[in-house]
């Protein structure tokens, strides 16, 4: 494929303060598609299509592969147009849309707006470098599957997740485009906020974004408020250039936030030497094949990460978050639907890990989340009063005290959930032949 659009992307990004290492180039990998690698020959600094005189060298440890200024990021924050370093560079959305839609949905519509703005968009070179709405084969996620493709995921968690995502995204799109079509001053856009464009924008965010918590307070340069929305909400953010490396859980990289020097930016640094000619990967954390296929459009053969999902009610989610902060020091699971990983071999055991061996097969936070979901009234009141009493960290909490019945229930639910998933996979496989 032609890499000209990536040459334009790099030129535009560098003009606005972005950086790409001189030993790094963009190339078209036959297996992975557009990727980054350490220069394999005397070719262009940034594109595997020209020639120059730079020697072949490995990429040393701690080297910065790429960096992107926060001012070049694209998200809901730009649509707000409230922060000097996060401007919209576009017509501001109607106040009603900004008030009633969730941050991630507004971000999706903002990307659609940039696509419709075409050459006049501030992010035009970036948008043109992305897989385009008509390039369904490059997008590759289950929402672009044919009927023949869907037959292969029938009966699996992926089929359920695909159907739920399509339903949710369509609902979000309908709410948003109705507001835009009915808003004064937006008449020329009527009919252009199509489902295909919204699905494309949401897919771009699901497959290439970083989380909003990576943007530090120093970037805002003013008190942080969203009106009726909370900054505790986590939403996706696109960072041009940073989304070029492909994902690998084996990649040893660091995401470095710079707020001391201008431009304030986010960088990807490698932790070990990468020989010339080798692809440079990013690491978005361990993910199951269900998550990878749903969000990115690929899976990893032999991946030991499986996932189980639960959809807690709002009250339950608040209790789960409170307990995870007290027990684990962080939130675990998705913001609306708790998704946790399960492995056939135990996770690495920290020195202070006193969990049952069976509990070490599931990701931190899973057992405690299930404990909340399966608790009776007495047990839930106890959890609220004692958020730091974590059954995942104490054998005493499992077999003694007020939560012993609850933990036995958790083990039963985990077992049933995994057996159900295994049965569905075997059954579907038999029908496929």
Enumerate the predicted regions with their spans:
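Eukaryotic helix-linker segments that join adjacent hydrophobic helices
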Residues: 74-128
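Long, positively charged leader/targeting segments at protein N-termini
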Residues: 2-42, 49-70, 77-81, 125-433
